[in-house]
Amino acid sequence: GGFPEMFASQLEANKSMLAAIAQAARQGMPIFAECGGYMYLGQCLKDFEDRIFNMTGILPQQVQMNKKLQMVGYVEAELLQDCCIGQAGMKLKGHEFHFSAEIPGVGDVVGNRAFSFTRMRNNAVYPGGFVSDKGNVLGSYLHIHFAGCVEAATAFVGSCWNYNISRQDK
């Protein structure tokens, strides 16, 4: 998480960190990112001045900052893909609060959408987030309320444990 738009230049310049995270993802390390972390896992970030900064490129989305709040509110989310926090069909609750938005149409053709979201206040349904092809990387704007779905936290710890065990065998 955090505010990558405030540090986009420094994040882009830290090539060794970008490469290390991308390599860890390719090697199957479980990576779970919410909001700012989701932005960092994407292809690029367009800031308030329309400057474009490359991010890790692990997930297909490109995001742009907006002066107006893009989303705030509680949502229910259903996992659409098996991934590091659970199986397809798992229901989670949480909230979204962000000034950035995915650039429309980018990523949708090649990406594996992570969630089907339902806004609690008006029942609007929309897709969100992405899961990597291997299922080890999950990113979205959703801030999960893990007390409402302990199974997701347990699954993520299990994914991390299994990854650690697999690394010991090498």
Where do the PLM segments sit?
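Cysteine-nucleophile active-site neighborhood
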Residues: 4-85, 156
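Amide-donor transfer/coupling interface in amidating biosynthetic enzymes
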Residues: 64-170
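Extended, subdomain-level signal for the structured scaffold at the beginning of enzyme domains
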Residues: 3-4, 148
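Short acidic (Asp/Glu) and glycine-rich catalytic loops that position anionic groups and cofactors
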Residues: 1-3, 37, 135-138
